[in-house]
A protein has these predicted regions:
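Carboxylate- and glycine-rich phosphate/diphosphate-binding segment that chelates Mg2+/Mn2+
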Residues: 79-170
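Short, conserved catalytic/metal-binding motifs centered on acidic residues
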Residues: 47, 119, 176
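Glycine-rich beta-alpha junction loops
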Residues: 9, 68, 101-102, 123-127, ...
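C-terminal charged capping/lid subdomain of soluble metabolic enzymes
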Residues: 5, 211-268
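Active-site segments that bind and position negatively charged phosphate/pyrophosphate groups
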Residues: 129-221
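A short secondary-structure junction signal
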Residues: 73-76, 107-109, 256, 261, ...
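Glycine/threonine-rich beta-strand-loop-alpha-helix active-site module
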Residues: 30-103
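ATP/NTP phosphate-donor binding region
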Residues: 1-40
Protein backbone atom coordinates (compact mmCIF):
# COMPACT_ATOMS: atom_id res chain seq x y z
CA UNK A 1 0.00 0.00 0.00
CA UNK A 2 1.18 3.54 -0.74
CA UNK A 3 2.33 5.96 1.95
CA UNK A 4 -0.34 7.88 3.87
CA UNK A 5 0.14 11.66 3.85
CA UNK A 6 -1.06 13.44 6.98
CA UNK A 7 -1.73 17.08 6.14
CA UNK A 8 -3.72 20.18 7.05
CA UNK A 9 -6.22 21.88 4.72
CA UNK A 10 -3.48 24.36 3.72
CA UNK A 11 -0.78 21.72 3.07
CA UNK A 12 -2.98 19.16 1.32
CA UNK A 13 -1.94 20.68 -2.03
CA UNK A 14 1.58 19.29 -1.48
CA UNK A 15 0.18 15.74 -1.39
CA UNK A 16 -1.84 15.93 -4.59
CA UNK A 17 -2.72 12.48 -5.90
CA UNK A 18 -1.68 10.74 -2.65
CA UNK A 19 -3.74 9.04 0.05
CA UNK A 20 -4.33 11.71 2.67
CA UNK A 21 -5.57 12.13 6.23
CA UNK A 22 -6.51 15.77 6.86
CA UNK A 23 -6.20 17.30 10.35
CA UNK A 24 -8.54 20.29 10.51
CA UNK A 25 -8.40 21.31 14.17
CA UNK A 26 -6.86 20.41 17.50
CA UNK A 27 -6.37 16.67 17.79
CA UNK A 28 -9.20 14.69 19.41
CA UNK A 29 -8.60 11.61 21.54
CA UNK A 30 -10.49 9.72 18.81
CA UNK A 31 -7.20 9.61 16.85
CA UNK A 32 -6.21 6.70 19.11
CA UNK A 33 -8.69 4.47 17.26
CA UNK A 34 -6.25 4.41 14.33
CA UNK A 35 -3.02 4.25 16.35
CA UNK A 36 -0.27 2.30 14.54
CA UNK A 37 -2.64 1.67 11.63
CA UNK A 38 -0.34 2.71 8.77
CA UNK A 39 3.07 1.25 8.01
CA UNK A 40 4.54 4.32 6.30
CA UNK A 41 3.43 7.89 6.96
CA UNK A 42 4.54 11.27 5.61
CA UNK A 43 3.48 14.40 7.55
CA UNK A 44 3.41 17.92 6.10
CA UNK A 45 2.22 20.58 8.51
CA UNK A 46 2.34 22.02 11.99
CA UNK A 47 2.10 20.52 15.46
CA UNK A 48 -1.35 18.92 15.29
CA UNK A 49 -0.60 17.34 11.90
CA UNK A 50 2.68 15.87 13.08
CA UNK A 51 1.21 14.75 16.41
CA UNK A 52 -1.45 12.83 14.46
CA UNK A 53 1.15 11.27 12.16
CA UNK A 54 3.25 10.15 15.15
CA UNK A 55 0.25 8.23 16.48
CA UNK A 56 -0.83 6.74 13.14
CA UNK A 57 2.62 5.61 11.93
CA UNK A 58 3.64 2.06 12.75
CA UNK A 59 6.99 1.51 11.01
CA UNK A 60 8.32 4.66 9.33
CA UNK A 61 7.55 8.36 9.70
CA UNK A 62 8.90 11.19 7.57
CA UNK A 63 8.04 14.74 8.70
CA UNK A 64 8.14 18.04 6.85
CA UNK A 65 7.33 20.56 9.61
CA UNK A 66 5.91 23.92 8.51
CA UNK A 67 5.85 25.58 11.94
CA UNK A 68 8.20 25.73 14.93
CA UNK A 69 6.18 23.36 17.15
CA UNK A 70 9.12 20.94 17.39
CA UNK A 71 6.69 18.02 17.46
CA UNK A 72 8.74 15.92 15.01
CA UNK A 73 11.47 15.46 17.62
CA UNK A 74 9.43 15.23 20.82
CA UNK A 75 8.35 11.91 22.32
CA UNK A 76 4.66 12.61 22.85
CA UNK A 77 1.57 13.85 21.02
CA UNK A 78 -0.91 16.41 22.34
CA UNK A 79 -4.50 15.16 22.17
CA UNK A 80 -7.74 16.56 23.58
CA UNK A 81 -10.40 14.72 25.57
CA UNK A 82 -13.14 17.31 25.26
CA UNK A 83 -11.66 20.43 26.86
CA UNK A 84 -8.89 18.54 28.69
CA UNK A 85 -5.38 18.33 27.20
CA UNK A 86 -3.54 15.02 27.44
CA UNK A 87 -0.01 13.95 26.48
CA UNK A 88 0.05 10.61 24.69
CA UNK A 89 3.36 8.72 24.38
CA UNK A 90 4.34 8.51 20.73
CA UNK A 91 7.32 7.99 18.48
CA UNK A 92 9.75 10.52 17.10
CA UNK A 93 10.10 10.96 13.34
CA UNK A 94 12.59 8.76 11.51
CA UNK A 95 13.37 11.58 9.08
CA UNK A 96 12.81 15.32 9.55
CA UNK A 97 13.30 17.67 6.62
CA UNK A 98 12.54 21.38 6.29
CA UNK A 99 11.32 22.19 2.78
CA UNK A 100 11.38 25.93 2.12
CA UNK A 101 8.54 25.59 -0.40
CA UNK A 102 6.24 24.13 2.27
CA UNK A 103 6.99 27.00 4.67
CA UNK A 104 5.82 29.85 2.44
CA UNK A 105 2.40 31.43 2.72
CA UNK A 106 2.01 31.31 6.50
CA UNK A 107 -0.10 34.20 7.79
CA UNK A 108 1.52 36.79 10.06
CA UNK A 109 -0.60 35.48 12.94
CA UNK A 110 0.59 31.89 12.49
CA UNK A 111 4.20 33.09 12.21
CA UNK A 112 3.84 35.00 15.47
CA UNK A 113 2.12 32.09 17.23
CA UNK A 114 4.81 29.60 16.22
CA UNK A 115 7.53 32.02 17.38
CA UNK A 116 5.75 32.20 20.74
CA UNK A 117 5.63 28.41 20.93
CA UNK A 118 9.35 27.83 20.49
CA UNK A 119 10.14 30.79 22.80
CA UNK A 120 7.91 29.19 25.44
CA UNK A 121 9.71 25.86 25.00
CA UNK A 122 12.97 27.63 25.82
CA UNK A 123 11.64 29.66 28.77
CA UNK A 124 9.60 26.82 30.28
CA UNK A 125 12.62 24.53 30.30
CA UNK A 126 15.26 27.12 31.21
CA UNK A 127 13.42 27.91 34.45
CA UNK A 128 12.34 24.33 35.11
CA UNK A 129 13.30 22.61 38.34
CA UNK A 130 14.26 19.65 36.14
CA UNK A 131 16.63 21.62 33.90
CA UNK A 132 20.08 20.17 33.29
CA UNK A 133 23.32 21.79 32.22
CA UNK A 134 22.74 20.46 28.70
CA UNK A 135 19.12 21.63 28.49
CA UNK A 136 19.98 25.11 29.80
CA UNK A 137 22.64 25.50 27.14
CA UNK A 138 20.14 24.56 24.43
CA UNK A 139 17.45 26.86 25.90
CA UNK A 140 19.85 29.79 25.85
CA UNK A 141 20.89 28.97 22.27
CA UNK A 142 17.25 29.01 21.14
CA UNK A 143 16.56 32.32 22.89
CA UNK A 144 19.60 33.87 21.24
CA UNK A 145 18.46 32.66 17.81
CA UNK A 146 14.99 34.09 18.40
CA UNK A 147 16.45 37.54 19.02
CA UNK A 148 16.56 37.75 15.22
CA UNK A 149 13.00 39.00 14.70
CA UNK A 150 13.34 38.90 10.92
CA UNK A 151 14.41 35.29 10.41
CA UNK A 152 12.69 33.37 7.63
CA UNK A 153 9.94 30.87 8.40
CA UNK A 154 12.24 28.03 7.34
CA UNK A 155 14.92 29.21 9.79
CA UNK A 156 12.28 29.50 12.50
CA UNK A 157 11.20 25.91 11.81
CA UNK A 158 14.84 24.79 12.22
CA UNK A 159 14.93 26.57 15.59
CA UNK A 160 11.63 24.91 16.45
CA UNK A 161 13.17 21.51 15.81
CA UNK A 162 15.79 22.36 18.43
CA UNK A 163 12.87 23.16 20.71
CA UNK A 164 11.52 19.67 20.06
CA UNK A 165 14.85 18.18 21.13
CA UNK A 166 14.70 20.38 24.22
CA UNK A 167 11.26 19.29 25.44
CA UNK A 168 12.29 15.67 24.89
CA UNK A 169 14.94 16.35 27.57
CA UNK A 170 12.86 18.48 29.95
CA UNK A 171 9.04 18.75 30.00
CA UNK A 172 7.37 22.12 29.49
CA UNK A 173 6.11 23.95 32.55
CA UNK A 174 4.35 27.26 33.26
CA UNK A 175 3.46 28.85 29.92
CA UNK A 176 2.27 25.63 28.35
CA UNK A 177 0.31 24.60 31.43
CA UNK A 178 -1.48 27.95 31.64
CA UNK A 179 -2.39 27.93 27.96
CA UNK A 180 -4.29 24.63 27.88
CA UNK A 181 -7.56 25.82 29.50
CA UNK A 182 -7.67 28.76 27.08
CA UNK A 183 -7.31 26.36 24.16
CA UNK A 184 -9.64 23.71 25.56
CA UNK A 185 -12.42 26.01 26.73
CA UNK A 186 -12.35 28.75 24.11
CA UNK A 187 -10.55 27.13 21.17
CA UNK A 188 -7.83 29.80 21.33
CA UNK A 189 -4.76 28.63 19.44
CA UNK A 190 -1.83 27.36 21.50
CA UNK A 191 0.68 30.09 20.64
CA UNK A 192 -1.91 32.84 20.92
CA UNK A 193 -2.93 31.65 24.39
CA UNK A 194 0.66 31.65 25.66
CA UNK A 195 1.40 35.09 24.25
CA UNK A 196 -0.98 36.64 26.76
CA UNK A 197 1.45 35.95 29.63
CA UNK A 198 4.70 36.92 27.89
CA UNK A 199 4.90 40.53 29.06
CA UNK A 200 3.87 39.73 32.64
CA UNK A 201 6.30 36.83 32.89
CA UNK A 202 9.18 38.83 31.42
CA UNK A 203 8.49 41.65 33.88
CA UNK A 204 8.52 39.14 36.77
CA UNK A 205 11.76 37.51 35.59
CA UNK A 206 13.33 40.89 34.74
CA UNK A 207 13.70 39.95 31.08
CA UNK A 208 13.26 42.35 28.17
CA UNK A 209 10.35 41.03 26.10
CA UNK A 210 11.24 43.53 23.36
CA UNK A 211 14.32 41.44 22.61
CA UNK A 212 12.04 38.82 21.02
CA UNK A 213 8.64 40.45 20.43
CA UNK A 214 7.13 43.76 19.39
CA UNK A 215 5.56 45.41 22.45
CA UNK A 216 2.63 46.93 20.54
CA UNK A 217 1.77 43.58 19.01
CA UNK A 218 1.82 41.83 22.39
CA UNK A 219 -0.42 44.50 23.93
CA UNK A 220 -2.96 44.33 21.10
CA UNK A 221 -3.02 40.53 21.19
CA UNK A 222 -3.79 40.63 24.92
CA UNK A 223 -6.73 42.96 24.28
CA UNK A 224 -8.02 40.72 21.50
CA UNK A 225 -7.54 37.58 23.57
CA UNK A 226 -9.43 38.95 26.57
CA UNK A 227 -12.33 39.72 24.24
CA UNK A 228 -12.53 36.03 23.30
CA UNK A 229 -13.24 34.97 26.89
CA UNK A 230 -17.02 35.04 27.56
CA UNK A 231 -18.11 37.48 30.25
CA UNK A 232 -20.24 34.80 31.90
CA UNK A 233 -17.18 32.66 32.64
CA UNK A 234 -15.70 33.87 35.90
CA UNK A 235 -12.03 34.58 36.32
CA UNK A 236 -11.94 32.36 39.40
CA UNK A 237 -13.17 29.36 37.38
CA UNK A 238 -10.55 29.96 34.70
CA UNK A 239 -7.79 30.22 37.29
CA UNK A 240 -9.01 26.99 38.91
CA UNK A 241 -8.70 25.20 35.57
CA UNK A 242 -5.19 26.60 35.05
CA UNK A 243 -4.02 25.47 38.48
CA UNK A 244 -5.07 21.88 37.72
CA UNK A 245 -2.01 21.44 35.51
CA UNK A 246 0.73 20.20 37.86
CA UNK A 247 3.50 21.03 35.39
CA UNK A 248 3.27 24.73 36.30
CA UNK A 249 4.71 23.86 39.74
CA UNK A 250 8.02 22.87 38.12
CA UNK A 251 8.67 26.46 37.02
CA UNK A 252 11.12 28.32 39.28
CA UNK A 253 9.37 31.66 39.74
CA UNK A 254 10.84 32.38 43.17
CA UNK A 255 7.56 31.99 45.02
CA UNK A 256 4.46 29.78 45.03
CA UNK A 257 2.35 29.99 41.89
CA UNK A 258 -1.18 30.91 42.98
CA UNK A 259 -4.29 32.24 41.28
CA UNK A 260 -3.24 35.77 42.22
CA UNK A 261 0.19 35.26 40.63
CA UNK A 262 -1.39 33.92 37.42
CA UNK A 263 -3.80 36.89 37.33
CA UNK A 264 -0.81 39.22 37.49
CA UNK A 265 1.00 37.37 34.69
CA UNK A 266 -2.03 37.58 32.42
CA UNK A 267 -2.99 41.11 33.42
CA UNK A 268 -6.45 39.92 34.47
Amino acid sequence: MSDLYVVSPSTKKYAWGQRTFVVKEKLSIDILYIENSESRVVAIGGGAVIDAAKIIAKDRLVCFPTTASGSSLSNHSVIWDGTVKKSHPSRRADVVEVNDDYCVGLSDEVKFNTRVDVWAHAIDTLYSKRATKESKKLSEHILERLSDKNMSVADLVHVGNKGGELIAMVPTTLLHGLSYPLTGLYDISHGYAMSMAIQGLCDTLELDADKWFDHTTLTQRNINLCAKIPEDYSKSNLLTEMLKYDKIKDFKLGHKITGAVISQLFGM
